[in-house]
Amino acid sequence: MRTFPELSRRRFLLGASSLALFAGLAPVRNARAAPKLDGYPFTLGVASGDPWPDGFVIWTRLAPKPLHEHGGMPMLAVPVKWQVAEDERFGKIVQSGEHLARPELGHSVHVEVSGLKPSRPYWYRFFVEGGEASAIGTVRTAPRASDTPGRLRIAVAGCQAYFHGWFDAYRHISEEPGLDVLFHYGDYIYEGSEAAARKSGYQIRDASGDVVERLHHGDELYTLDDYRRRYAQYKSDADLQAAHASVAFIASFDDHEVDNDWNGIWDQDRTPPELFALRRFHAMQAWYENSPVRRTQFPRADGGTAYFRRLDYGNLLRMHVLDTRSYRSNQICPNPKALAKCRFEQGKDSSILGPAQEAWLHSGLDAGKRWNLIAQQVWVMPLQGREPEGGLHGPYEDKWDGFPDSRRRLIQGISDRKLTNVVIATGDAHMNAVAEVPLRDDERDGPAVATEFLATSISSNGDGAVDSPSVRRFSQADNPFLKLIDNLRGYHTYDITATEWRTDIKVMDQVQRKGGRLSTRASFIVEPHAPKLHRA
């Protein structure tokens, strides 16, 4: 069992000196005897993440009153007991322990469980003094490095604006049979205010059709307490809790966990970097506190945290989880409204990943694995859209489009290694898109080097449609590599074997009214010897 470590003086100064930036913390008195809590403490559910062959992370956060100050918790460290069992009735408990939920970390609990068997399910739960128990979650360990699992099943989801619709898609995810893991590509929360949510005009209805308020609580997010409260609001959703309890999440982040379209040290308003760094640090601390991730993801004040990481599933799949926000070169056109006036001249040193992450990715692409999955946030495919007056729009600067040399290095690196098994998982754009990524941007119908599946949003942009102006602008004449595009809501599932990769595009009939139904819009097959898409 691994829990959050005691911090050395050096690490405190370099990394956890970040605690000096925490907002509004009073001095804390350690308490091994649990204080009386003002209500049921596990209102935010449970979660698991980042499975390895011998274990995984289990998570909860104590918040008897989620939207109150400090989640309704006293400013004390509270002991939380945890158990991991081989059966859902907890007849055979194989690991257990106690962890202090500390106010410095929003009373979150991250336990890194180890010493377990590979390729099998486990169940977990938490307790506080007095016997109050959490919900029960389930999670599977990964296979051993030398194993070839017969099948691996992955869901891909993200972009869940609370005020745009219900999270019914997560209820359907919780009912998906045999999921091994879910990759969350980001935009888990949105940073805007209640006033902005109200102004957006999305009309939300309950299952009976009555209009209800589903708005953000509070102002735009800047402080640690702001971000903590917003996560508490989102995590109070029962459908999201059900998904977390049913499958391990591989958590990443995009822009709205901090601020729209931020990149590196800049936000879109060009706030002085030293001030934006405070906001970003608060946001990333809250992301850590509310995500089932390992302690290596704990944010450091010196910016030294590497959020990118790699997970292997035997010799069947290597998953490269990227961070396409933290290390970006400065965007040339930070204001999208001025894009047409910008000269698009990215230098050879521009990067969406930064030099260290880019080198790490290229060195880790493995021909020895049957499949390589690049799990990231923004589209790689060179999409071109038409303006209403007919001219081509572009580049889409917030995507890999905005870093063409970085994209060329990625695509050329795949080609040079003669890899034919690279699949790219993408989100962010609130639409479904399926593509064969071409080797050259100027040969758009030329040979492909990878396939890309852009998964739509859970709720962002509301109900959506198969056809809409937002996707109609991407024609197949301009984008011959594009095999499907729509503006529906939902998620993707991957069924992966040694001989075949199948992606199912799962879509909702509605999200603005409670009770949306799920269907499969389309299915695609990829074979590991060629980056070609075939309709199933």
Tell where the protein language model's regions lie, with residue ranges.
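Sec/Tat signal peptide C-region and signal peptidase I cleavage site
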Residues: 29-32
